[in-house]
UniProtKB/Swiss-Prot annotation:
This is RNA-binding protein 10. Residues 129-209, 300-384 form the RRM domain. SMART domains: G_patch, RRM, ZnF_RBZ. The gene is Rbm10. Keywords: Acetylation, Metal-binding, Methylation, Nucleus, Phosphoprotein, Repeat, RNA-binding, Zinc, Zinc-finger. The modification Omega-N-methylarginine is found at residue 902. It comes from Mus musculus (Mouse). Binds to ssRNA containing the consensus sequence 5'-AGGUAA-3'. May be involved in post-transcriptional processing, most probably in mRNA splicing. Binds to RNA homopolymers, with a preference for poly(G) and poly(U) and little for poly(A). May bind to specific miRNA hairpins.
Length: 930
């Protein structure tokens, strides 16, 4: 360890010292002693300079400032200068001088040695994009340094002047950071390593920051990162000596503990296949590098970026349904508090890091990439606070779950679809497929004692919110699959090639449409078949796949819509009169609560369709959702039904009743409803668009009442167009039913609300274990009675609804039964007052406020006391009767006047009236004036 003794300034006077010199020395000796080469020019650490002495002796400081990290480096200028001085010094290695006094050493160097030192200094300085300025004036600021930079035409990223933390004064040095190394080198060469700031020469040096040593330690038991001074693990309590595991420099915990890409998957998880690769687009090496998720921030949470502001949680869950089994508790959409729209990103949290890594790898390997509501989604690991990222081998083994099985199975379908290239989709003969994944899945499900993920299939001939098919092949040789995610999600046709015994459930396709010209005209629906239906199909292999289901609906060509740009919520203007946001580009009004648009010209509510990139009326969507089924039902009817035309207020009133019931049934439907495969199609079809259409009608009625204008909506259907059947809200179609059906369909309609075969109440959407429990539910359940009352009211006519509402209002009104009794029987006479037992003598009424107004009588207590002492009325008081005769009267004075002041009293007493007081006052003032 280096140690150098530092003396005072008076000691550094010369080579031979100042105390032993005689005063008779010649002038030549004096001039030689004061030669500049005799001075000690060693660079001692100053207050504003490097604190390297501190760092030489103590390297364990945990809190180092930024300026110390810049200066306290092994290759700093001062240390280099000392090493060169010791190298050229004849005294030998660094340490104490031989004679014990540094003043006995000759520190003078020749001119050649100084030039050699400068050359070595320039060679040893390593170029850096950070330049250090030393010997700055105390008055110099950052602006002065920036002025020097601007004068040379150089742009710096940051200029930082080091100041004292307590006083705020400059410490005499600063750092200038450049964006590129070339800029720093060019500036140093242009100024020849020196500057002139405020008339003072400033030296310039390359800064070499000291690398920070990772002093934290990892516990090899639980994987938690602990601070340096902690002697025991924060989580498991294992001592540091037993559980210490040093982190290599530049690495992180998650890079060591997390196996990705299927290289070190734990037992119980399905192996990940190779990611999908489109031929001619990417090489296998480039795709494997790009698709592998980065493990730098690996955790159990994934972030979805670039979301549509109108995307909901249902659309996100639907887009991710082919790859993972998620619920609303796994997804969190970040919304704006003011507009209630999402802020463009959402988080997906899974149970383990392994599952999150598998899902991330699947989503990043999709080609085309994942899209939700027409926008391409960027998928990454979420960057959060420090958490427990590592897990032991046993916890990773227990991380196998149904979600990871579904992820691996979905990615297996993608890899199987990509093995044969694009030509494999149209091959008439299907190549043999390896079903080891499904067999492994079956074994896992049996070991857990539950059915597999695909054991229950309930979606028949329907489009899920996040799964839509592509065009069908007219020859039946094989559908042309689309590997788009989100709205056009990954095709699951590979599941239809699986063996019967491979999995309890099976995906099946029903190709529809006669012409395969475009993917927009025809649609292909995917059906999940329950085991019972699958068994019936296997018994008759020659039967077509669609024979086990109701006849497929014929697809219809979509109507032509105008294309619009994606709505930009930031350009909307708030309208105080309507409470909506006005879109200046389209002229529509936006409702942030329902996320729908209102057209003031056509008086219609619209919603944004990301697939068609246009605004679609809400009523049109609700009617189109049931158009195909209604067409097939009308072919069996010969008579035409009458349809009622309702105003917006009436429809909004009807929808308001149903909105209340829907909100109550949502939680019951999610928690207690067990799907039944034999339910009717119209009861099973739950369209989010139709639900939004009903909710928006309620908003329309509220807007109409606020503007006090009647807005007549177009007819729900024309005479030659059938009425839409019941969908999610089965009672709304009853509003358009004929009156004849309403009269005859009361008990029959209520009977249809119960499925006795499945022991289920279709109205409450609940299934019961026995018939007695179902009957008890119908008789005693308050929820069933409430839903039944809403169902009955929904089928009433307008007159009946008005009468029922009037009756309800009368019942809710307060009934004054006392007034009814008085009107019927009259008011009874008041009872006679009770008679007193002893009748007292009626005394004359005396004004209690002025008892002495008329003077004092001889019957008062004071007069009787005086009479008892010998006083007689009319005589004065006192022993000799020399006192006053008349009693003293209280007189009023003018407020604020003294006792003896003139005009303070006008002879008015307190018992006189206002008129008498005014008269006496006038008389007194008149007498005083004379």
């Amino acid at each position: 360890m280096e140690y150098e003794r530092r003396g005072g300034r008076g000691d550094r006077t010369g080579r031979y010292g100042a105390t032993d010199r005689s005063q008779d020395d010649s002038g030549e000796n004096r001039s030689r002693d004061h030669d500049y080469r005799d001075m000690d020019y060693r660079s001692y650490p100053r207050e504003y300079g490097s604190q390297e002495g501190k760092h030489e002796y103590d390297d364990s400081s945990e809190e180092q400032s930024a300026e110390d990290s810049y200066e306290a480096s092994p290759g700093s200028e001062t240390q280099r200068r000392r090493r060169r001085r010791h190298r050229h010094s004849p005294t030998g290695p660094p340490g104490f001088p031989r004679d014990g006094d540094y003043r006995d050493q000759d520190y003078r160097t020749e001119q050649g040695e100084e030039e050699e030192e400068e050359d070595e200094e320039e060679e040893e300085e390593k170029a850096s994009n950070i330049v250090m300025l030393r010997m700055l004036p105390q008055a110099a600021t950052e602006d002065d340094i920036r002025g020097q930079l601007q004068s040379h035409g150089v742009q710096a990223r940051e200029v930082r002047l080091m100041r004292n933390k307590s006083s705020g004064q400059s410490r005499g040095f600063a750092f200038v950071e450049f964006s590129h190394l070339q800029d720093a080198t060019r500036w140093m060469e242009a100024n020849q390593h020196s500057l002139n700031i405020l008339g003072q020469k400033v030296s310039m040096h390359y800064s070499d920051p000291k690398p920070k040593i990772n002093e934290d330690w990892l516990c090899n038991k639980c994987g938690v990162q602990n601070f340096k001074r902690r002697e025991k693990c924060f989580k498991c309590g294992v001592p540091k000596s037993e559980a210490e595991q040093k982190l290599p420099l530049g690495t992180r915990l998650d890079q060591q503990a997390l196996p990705l890409g299927g290289r070190e998957l734990s037992q119980g998880l399905l192996p990940l296949p190779q990611p999908y690769q489109a031929q001619g687009v990417l090489t296998s090496q480039a795709l494997s590098q790009g698709s592998e998720p980065s493990s730098e921030n690996a955790n159990d949470t994934i972030i979805l970026r670039n979301l549509n502001p109108h995307s909901t949680m249902d659309s996100i869950l639907g887009a991710l349904a082919p790859y993972a089994v998620l619920s609303s508790s796994n997804v969190r959409v970040i919304k704006d508090k003011q507009t209630q729209l999402n802020r463009g990103f959402a988080f997906i949290q899974l149970s383990t890091i392994v599952e999150a890594a598998q899902l991330l790898q699947i989503l990043q390997a999709l080609h085309p990439p994942l899209t939700i509501d027409g926008k391409t989604i960027n998928v990454e690991f979420a960057k959060g606070s420090k958490r427990d990222m590592a897990s032991n081998e046993g916890s990773r083994i227990n991380a196998a779950s149904v979600a990871s099985t579904a992820i691996a199975a979905a990615q297996w379908a993608i890899s199987q679809a990509s093995q044969g290239g694009e030509s494999a989709w149209a091959a008439p003969e299907e190549p043999p497929v390896d079903y080891s994944y499904y067999q492994q899945d079956e074994g896992y499900g049996s070991s857990q004692g539950t059915d597999s993920l695909y054991a229950h299939g309930y979606l028949k001939n329907s489009k899920g919110p996040g799964m839509t098919g592509t065009k069908g092949d007219p020859a039946g040789t094989g559908p042309e699959a689309s590997l788009e995610a989100g709205a056009d999600s990954v095709s699951l046709q590979a599941f239809s090639r699986a063996q019967p015994g491979a999995a309890p459930g099976l995906y099946q396709q029903s190709a529809e449409g006669s012409s395969g010209q475009s993917t927009a005209t025809n649609s292909q629906s995917y059906t999940i078949i329950s085991p019972a239906v699958l068994k019936a199909e296997l018994q008759s292999p020659t039967q077509p796949s669609s024979s086990a289901f109701p006849p497929a609906t014929s697809p219809t060509a979509p109507e032509a819509y105008s294309q619009y740009p994606v709505p930009d919520v930031s350009t909307y203007q708030y309208d105080e009169t309507s409470g909506y946001y006005y879109d200046p580009q389209t002229g529509l009004y936006y409702d942030p609560n329902s996320q729908y648009y209102y057209n003031a010209q056509s008086q219609q509510y619209l919603y944004w369709d990301g697939e068609r990139r246009t605004y679609i009326p809400a009523l049109e969507q609700s009617a189109d959702g049931h158009k195909d089924t209604g067409a097939s039902s009308k072919e069996g009817k010969e008579k035409k039904e009458k349809h009622k035309t309702k105003t917006a207020q009436q429809i909004a009133k009807d929808m308001e009743r149903w909105a209340r019931s829907l909100n109550k049934q949502k939680e019951n439907f999610k928690n207690s409803f067990q799907p039944i495969s034999a339910l009717r199609d119209d009861e099973r079809r739950e369209s989010a668009t139709a639900d939004a259409g009903y909710a928006i009608l309620e908003k329309k009625g509220a807007l109409a009442e606020r503007q006090h204008t009647s807005m007549d909506l177009p007819k729900l259907a024309s005479d030659d167009r059938p009425s839409p059947p019941r969908g999610l809200v089965a009672a709304y179609s009853g509003e358009s039913d004929s009156e004849e059906e309403q009269e005859r369909g009361g008990p029959e309609r209520e009977e249809k609300l119960t499925d006795w075969q499945k022991l289920a109440c279709l109205l409450c959407r609940r299934q019961f274990p026995s018939k007695e429990a179902l009957i008890r539910h119908q008789q005693l359940s308050g929820l069933h009675k409430q839903n039944l009352e809403i169902h009955r009211r929904a089928h009433l006519s307008e007159n009946e609804l008005e009468a029922l509402e009037k009756n309800d209002m009368e019942q809710m009104k307060y009934r004054d039964r006392a007034a009814e009794r008085r009107e019927k029987y009259g008011i009874p006479e008041p009872p006679e007052p009770k008679r007193r037992k002893y009748g007292g003598i009626s005394t004359a009424s005396v004004d209690f406020e002025q008892p002495t107004r008329d003077g004092l009588g001889s019957d008062n207590i004071g007069s009787r006391m005086l009479q008892a002492m010998g006083w007689k009325e009319g005589s004065g008081l006192g022993r000799k009767k020399q006192g006053i005769v008349t009693p003293i009267e209280a007189q009023t004075r003018v407020r604020g006047s003294g006792l003896g002041a003139r005009g303070s009293s006008y002879g008015v007493t307190s018992t006189e009236s206002y008129k008498e007081t005014l008269h006496k006052t006038m008389v007194t003032r008149f007498n005083e004036a004379q």
